[in-house]
From Swiss-Prot:
GO terms for biological process: mitochondrial translation. GO terms for cellular component: mitochondrial inner membrane; mitochondrial small ribosomal subunit; mitochondrion. It comes from Bos taurus (Bovine). It comes from the Eukaryota. This is Small ribosomal subunit protein mS23. The keyword Ribosomal protein applies.
Length: 190
């Protein structure tokens, strides 16, 4: 049993105790008498971890603020926007933060309808000079411009436009910066 590696059968104390009784171990380990005098409240026995299916539940609850719901609505409607966060400026406020502040300011004035508050906060930012573009409209405009390009390429109107403006000549990919009189001196071109 000494070389069986059955760590799962019992605790280290019970296995050591049995080895001493069988005469395999001649001397007691230093910790054996201490463990015997002060046994733990729960015996340390190996247990296989249960298989978990699905997402593991976190022991802490997520903290949501009212502002987070406003931000989620803002990003769903307007996206992150073209302007990046300026992390070097400690007084920088993102468009979303300015929107949330306007939303809360209008809410304190007594408005209760969330949709109306959302629209009014957008209008207030527009009055300050911040232009908000809805994500859905931008996507449909891009798709619409692609469709119009495809339809134009098949029509006669685009052919006449090509005849008026001849296509540009292709520029070679590898351009040498050497003057015509200079020869390359055994070096391969870049």
């Amino acid at each position: 049993m000494a070389g069986s590696r059955l760590e799962t059968v019992g605790s280290i104390f019970t296995r050591t105790r049995d080895l001493i009784r069988a005469g395999v171990l001649k001397e007691k380990p230093l910790w054996f008498d201490v463990y015997n005098a002060f046994p733990p409240l729960r015996e340390p026995v190996f247990r296989r971890p249960r298989l978990r299916y699905g997402k593991a539940k976190s022991p802490t609850q997520d903290i949501y603020y009212h502002e987070d719901q406003i931000r989620a609505k803002f990003y769903a409607a307007y996206g992150s926007g073209p302007k990046a966060f300026d992390l070097f400026n400690p007084n920088f406020k993102s468009t979303c933060q300015r929107f949330v502040e306007k939303y809360i300011e209008l809410q304190k004035l007594g408005e209760t309808d969330e949709e109306k508050l959302f629209v009014e906060a957008g209008k207030a930012l527009l009055a300050e000079g911040v232009i908000l573009r809805r994500v859905e409209k931008a996507r449909t405009q891009q798709e619409g411009s692609q469709v119009s390009r495809k339809s134009e390429s098949m029509g006669v109107e685009s052919q006449t436009a090509l005849e008026e403006n001849p296509p540009l000549k292709e520029v070679p990919q590898a351009q040498h910066l050497e003057s015509p009189g200079e020869e390359s001196k055994g070096l391969s071109p870049p």
